[in-house]
Amino acid sequence: MVLADLGRKITSALRSLSNATIINEEVLNAMLKEVCTALLEADVNIKLVKQLRENVKSAIDLEEMASGLNKRKMIQHAVFKELVKLVDPGVKAWTPTKGKQNVIMFVGLQGSGKTTTCSKLAYYYQRKGWKTCLICADTFRAGAFDQLKQNATKARIPFYGSYTEMDPVIIASEGVEKFKNENFEIIIVDTSGRHKQEDSLFEEMLQVANAIQPDNIVYVMDASIGQACEAQAKAFKDKVDVASVIVTKLDGHAKGGGALSAVAATKSPIIFIGTGEHIDDFEPFKTQPFISKLLGMGDIEGLIDKVNELKLDDNEALIEKLKHGQFTLRDMYEQFQNIMKMGPFSQILGMIPGFGTDFMSKGNEQESMARLKKLMTIMDSMNDQELDSTDGAKVFSKQPGRIQRVARGSGVSTRDVQELLTQYTKFAQMVKKMGGIKGLFKGGDMSKNVSQSQMAKLNQQMAKMMDPRVLHHMGGMAGLQSMMRQFQQGAAGNMKGMMGFNNM
């Protein structure tokens, strides 16, 4: 994600405070210069950058500060607060009502990724248990209906459109009426892309809006145009009642920061951001968690939401087995399935404090997903006895012929099968030790259920299993312990502690 470059530069500037022996005006000005340069390079409007600098300077009076105060943390807090303000329009975004029919109309310029974004939004709500559908009212662009149809079919989302009817108002009206009669909760209408100067298309957009009376009009905006987004958003707001904005293509353009701040300047709430071409490269936009992730401070709230989506609490049988320190190959297979359901690895890693959104490149991510699928393919070639055995890898060591059979069945080498079994053995040993810790699976605050000595042992075991590079990014053992504590308590509000920003 190109925005990660901005995050890395700002984080580097903030960390320079830690290297300074004394925090004085000179150090503060040097740090602010680095932050402002990074923002200007990301195409943030110079007036907004100047305002941020002035606000931080006025909030931090080094001469008036009491000697006992932690000046570094006060400065970091002030910068964090101003960065949040930079992308916060200060307007509450529209949200759909469960059990009600919510009609959402998409508008935007040609090439902004509007049709793809329609499918992403429908898929996002579908995964959360909403009844969603898509309507293609774009009769201007050749192939628009085919594209929407292809996306909808792949995601198994009902859709409506026509190859013969050329009036978008009729298509939109018929589609909305059809899906309302079928009690769909999220009805998304894709309209023709337009350019600012095309009055006829603007007129068409108004006619469609008047016909279907949408609950929310979403303007889809391409991040690559940077701060020019402000003029565009205002032009559309003047014509129709744009209630929300989705910014796309944030993964490939250095001007993403400028685009986000420009939209915020129009007082239009950004509800989602597009971070890639795949259907799950799509995230809700929340200002504080966004800045937290940008600076490598994580988003525990978002991570917990992802885990809750999997409904892991329903898996009582697994919890019971873990209590007794049991973990089979089938259990590992099911956990791999859960990881796949959570979405792109880079998105998940960005939510873990200590990892930036740049920690895993697209190439590494694809490689990791391919490796995970390969491991699952190997397990697909195992029989029930092998998958459900509590002896795990011992079944294979007693009868080496099983390894050769699984390797042939999955089209891999015997070494690949042995590597999987080695990995599984590490997991199983960890679970066995966890099973011996009373109170670990009671739920609630882990610190109240588990003794400090047992918790220390558990953290040491986890640290041994982890890649040293990963542990370093988390801030060593202290970072790992802090993350475990936050995740168990479901505490999203104190994620800043991960980088030492405890007073934020």
UniProtKB/Swiss-Prot annotation:
Compartments where found: Nucleus speckle; Cytoplasm; Endoplasmic reticulum
InterPro entries for this protein: AAA+_ATPase, P-loop_NTPase, Signal_recog_part_SRP54_M_sf, Signal_recog_particl_SRP54_hlx, Signal_recog_particle_SRP54_M, SRP/SRP_N, SRP54, SRP54_euk
Chief localisation class: nucleus
Annotated EC: 3.6.5.4
BP GO annotations: exocrine pancreas development; granulocyte differentiation; neutrophil chemotaxis; protein targeting to ER; SRP-dependent cotranslational protein targeting to membrane; SRP-dependent cotranslational protein targeting to membrane, signal sequence recognition; SRP-dependent cotranslational protein targeting to membrane, translocation
Chain spans, region NG domain: 1-295
Catalytically driven reaction(s): GTP + H2O = GDP + phosphate + H(+)
Function per UniProt: Component of the signal recognition particle (SRP) complex, a ribonucleoprotein complex that mediates the cotranslational targeting of secretory and membrane proteins to the endoplasmic reticulum (ER). As part of the SRP complex, associates with the SRP receptor (SR) component SRPRA to target secretory proteins to the endoplasmic reticulum membrane. Binds to the signal sequence of presecretory proteins when they emerge from the ribosomes. Displays basal GTPase activity, and stimulates reciprocal GTPase activation of the SR subunit SRPRA.
Protein name: Signal recognition particle subunit SRP54
Organism annotation: Homo sapiens (Human)
Lineage of origin: Eukaryota, Metazoa, Chordata, Craniata, Vertebrata
Name of the encoding gene: SRP54
